[in-house]
Amino acid sequence: MNGAAVIQPAPIPFYTVLVLYLGIMAFIGWYAGRKTNNIGDFFVLSGKAGVVVSGIAYFSTQFSMGTFLGTPGTIYGVGYAGMAISVPGAVFCMILPALLIGRKLITLGHKYGFLTMADYLTDRYHSKKMSGVLGVMMLFFLVPMMGAQIIGAGVIVHVFTGLPEWVGVVGMGIIVILYCMTGGMKGAMMTDVIQGSLMIATAVVTFIVSIVMGGGFSNINHTLQSMNEAYLTFPGANGYMPWTYYISNIVLWSFFTMGQPHLFTKFFAMKDHKTMFKAILLGTAGMFFSATLIEWAGVNGIASIQNIEKADQIIPMILQRGMNPFLASIFIAGIVAAGMSTIDGILVTTTGAVTRDIYQKIINKNATDEAVMSLSKVVTVIIGIVVICFGVFQPGSIFEINLFAFSGMAIFVVPILFGIYWKKATAKGAIASVIVGIISLLLFTLNPSVKALAMGFHALFPTTIIASIVMIVVSKFTKTPPQETIDRHFTV
């Protein structure tokens, strides 16, 4: 069966459901905008987010088009071993950040009014240069991350309507820009609750449909074995998942989430420590459950659908071929939700990097909060347009782009952890660690000779070690922040 034969457009049901869904999201953004009274509301909900909002918003922002399209698409060519890409890491991706940095961030955020990652790093290291470094890095890496999500919208529109992918890219981009521009973090987190719930439902339904299409577990496994026995064993087809890469993925999608600004900021939005720990239980359950089922569906799809145009299409095609068009469209909205919930969180965070961390702290130190809020809406539109352009040109697969962007921001784990646990960490040490870390990451990723030195582990492993050494060495020979700053961060 060829790819063109697999795609069976059903545009009317798809448009009906999607327009209704996007209309609801737009209304929530408008409503949230009416309730957004100050800059604290816009960026972190004034630190009032409860258990349900915090837990679901964290996991729905962490999970993305990559989880629902890119990762299953990668697994589609690997088999069961591919599920190790993110399922094990999902267990720890809220627990580790909460235990290592969450409690302290909530306390500091409420006490000193921190709204962004740059607020924390700038204050901890007593250096406004940190704002500039973080702001530039966020623009460089988070725009591609948003672009990966919006590419997924194009894939979905193409599968369900037969229209070019750019139509879905532009449509989704406009809706997200509108509700983030008007509602900020309040709009983002309110929509995240709906989107996260829909994502869980989509994972469950897709998994069930994939089993039915494949004729049950036994038949699916028999088919996989007849196609390629490697689908059933480690390291998977083409040796994709050796033990070094397996360990890398567990650490990558759990420990290194601490360096993601859009997730880091979620701690400032939480009401208190009790809320955080309850939110961890809720969010972790949602992540593990959703990741397991949607990725397993990708494996099941190998047995029932072959020769598709793009591997990223496997989940939409399972829903399209296995369900009534209207029902399929409802659950495909869950995949759209996965992308939107990630984009909105990142877009608000990136806007904050430009308006607060670069403009208010470096360019115009006298700018009022009202001026920053007005500028934020303009910046949201500009960044959104850049993301749409990125999505239209599609420089790589959803999974590849996501992994690149995530890895780049993960370098900030070094200044964050040293800032929280080592009093002698300095601003110059932090900045040097990030710069050297980014250069090392690019070398370990792009240069085959250097990449071989990682011995099969992800580039972030040696990169983090190098960045940590740079942090320690440079800090030893540079001036520490004032004692007042140290006391403010280590006596809370």
List each language-model region with its residue ranges.
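Membrane-embedded helix-loop-helix hairpins and adjacent transmembrane boundary segments
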Residues: M1-V492
